[in-house]
C-alpha cells in the first residue's frame, strides 16, 4: 500500500465532514467543499455489493471539485470489499473507509456496521483484503464499543488489529453503539461521549493518525480536541449549521471568513449546471437550508426555500429571492 508521508497525511486529516446517510450526497459535498476547501469529505455509506453491481454513476459518481474525497463502504465480505475498493480507485477516490459504526437494524441484519466491532479478526481480514487490492489508504470509522462494552483494552485491541492489518487511520466516534432499543438518531445522541478514550488512544499510539467524531459543534470545541487528536470530523453541526464548517476552515487555514451571501453565490454555477441537466432545485437547496442558522432572517431563508424549491420549474431566482428576503428581515430586526 502506498501512503503519503505520515506528517502530510496527518495534516490532511485535521478537518473532515462525516459520512451521513441521506445527507452527504454529491450536491451536499460540493457545497461543503465551497465552505471548507481543505476538508476531507466522505460519501454516504455504500454497500460493497451496490458498488459492484449497481448504477455506479448514481451511487459513487462525484464532481472533481470534491477532492480529497473518501468512499465509505459497508460490508463484511473481504473479497467483495476488495473488489469494491478496486472500483473506487478506478473512479478516482482518495481513500476507502470501512463503516464499523452504523447501528441500524438493517445494517446489523447484513452483518456490517457497528456489530463488526465484536468481530475484530473479520474486520482485520476485510482491511487486509482492501489494502492488497488498492494503493489507496484504507481507513476505519468505528465506535468505542457496542451495548454495555466498557473496557478500554477491548477497544484498543480492536484498533490494534485493524491497524495491524493495514488501516492507515481511524475515525473514532467517541460513544458506544447500542444495538438494541435505540434508533440510529438516538444512537448519535443518547450513549455518553467519552473523548478521553480517543485522546488516550492517540497518546499511547502517537504514530497512528486518530480523527475524533461525535458531538463536535463549535470552532472552540474543535480547536480544543485538536490538542489531543490529529483531526476532527464534524457531523450534524456541519449540516444543520454549515457556516460553522466554514469558520473552522478559516481558523485552521488562517484565511479570512467569507460572508454567507458570498458562499451562497459561489454555489450558483454548480446549481445552475444541475438545473440545466434537468435536476430539480430541491435536490441542491435542501443542503443549504441552515446557512443562515442563528442569524436574523435565517428562518425566512429556510421557509422560502422549503416552500418553493419542490415546485416544477423552480430555479436559482428562488434562492436569490430567499437571500433578499433574509436581508430585508435582518434590516427590519436591526432597525
From Swiss-Prot:
Annotated CDD domains: DUS_like_FMN
The UniProt record lists the keyword Oxidoreductase: yes
Chain residues that bind FMN: 19-21, 72, 141, 173, 213-215, 235-236
Disulfide cysteine pairs (residue numbers): none
Enzyme class: oxidoreductase
Active site: residue positions: 102 (proton donor)
UniProt similarity note: Belongs to the Dus family. DusA subfamily.
Function: Catalyzes the synthesis of 5,6-dihydrouridine (D), a modified base found in the D-loop of most tRNAs, via the reduction of the C5-C6 double bond in target uridines. Specifically modifies U20 and U20a in tRNAs.
Name this protein carries in UniProt: tRNA-dihydrouridine(20/20a) synthase
Organism field: Xanthomonas campestris pv. campestris (strain ATCC 33913 / DSM 3586 / NCPPB 528 / LMG 568 / P 25)
Amino acid at each position: 500500500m502506498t501512503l503519503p508521508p505520515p506528517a502530510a497525511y496527518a495534516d490532511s486529516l485535521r478537518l473532515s465532514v462525516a459520512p451521513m446517510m441521506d445527507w452527504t450526497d454529491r450536491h451536499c459535498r460540493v457545497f461543503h467543499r465551497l465552505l471548507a476547501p481543505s476538508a476531507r469529505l466522505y460519501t454516504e455509506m455504500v454497500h460493497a455489493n451496490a458498488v459492484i453491481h449497481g448504477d455506479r454513476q448514481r451511487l459513487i459518481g462525484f464532481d472533481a471539485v470534491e477532492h480529497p474525497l473518501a468512499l465509505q463502504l459497508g460490508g463484511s465480505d473481504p473479497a467483495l470489499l476488495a473488489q469494491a475498493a478496486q472500483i473506487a480507485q478506478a473512479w478516482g477516490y482518495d481513500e476507502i473507509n470501512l463503516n464499523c459504526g452504523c447501528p441500524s437494524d438493517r445494517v446489523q441484519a447484513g452483518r456490517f456496521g457497528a456489530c463488526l466491532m465484536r468481530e475484530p479478526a473479520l474486520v482485520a481480514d476485510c482491511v487486509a483484503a482492501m489494502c492488497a487490492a488498492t494503493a489507496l489508504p484504507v481507513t476505519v470509522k468505528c465506535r468505542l464499543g457496542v451495548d454495555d462494552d466498557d473496557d478500554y483494552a477491548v477497544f484498543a485491541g480492536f484498533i490494534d488489529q485493524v491497524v495491524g492489518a493495514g488501516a492507515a487511520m481511524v475515525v473514532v466516534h467517541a460513544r458506544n453503539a447500542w444495538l438494541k432499543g435505540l434508533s440510529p438518531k438516538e444512537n448519535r445522541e443518547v450513549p455518553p461521549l467519552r473523548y478521553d478514550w480517543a485522546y488516550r488512544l492517540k497518546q499511547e499510539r502517537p504514530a497512528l493518525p486518530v480523527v475524533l467524531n461525535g458531538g463536535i459543534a463549535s470552532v472552540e470545541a474543535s480547536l480544543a480536541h485538536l490538542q489531543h487528536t490529529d483531526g476532527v470530523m464534524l457531523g450534524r453541526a456541519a449540516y444543520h449549521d454549515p457556516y460553522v464548517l466554514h469558520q473552522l476552515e478559516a481558523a485552521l487555514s488562517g484565511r479570512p471568513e467569507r460572508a454567507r451571501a458570498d458562499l451562497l453565490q459561489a454555489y450558483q454555477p454548480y446549481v445552475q449546471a444541475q438545473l440545466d441537466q434537468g435536476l430539480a432545485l430541491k435536490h441542491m437547496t435542501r443542503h443549504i437550508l441552515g446557512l443562515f442558522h442563528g442569524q436574523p432572517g435565517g428562518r425566512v431563508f429556510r421557509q422560502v426555500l422549503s416552500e418553493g424549491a419542490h415546485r416544477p420549474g423552480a430555479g436559482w431566482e428562488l434562492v436569490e429571492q430567499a437571500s433578499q428576503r433574509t436581508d430585508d428581515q435582518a434590516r427590519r430586526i436591526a432597525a
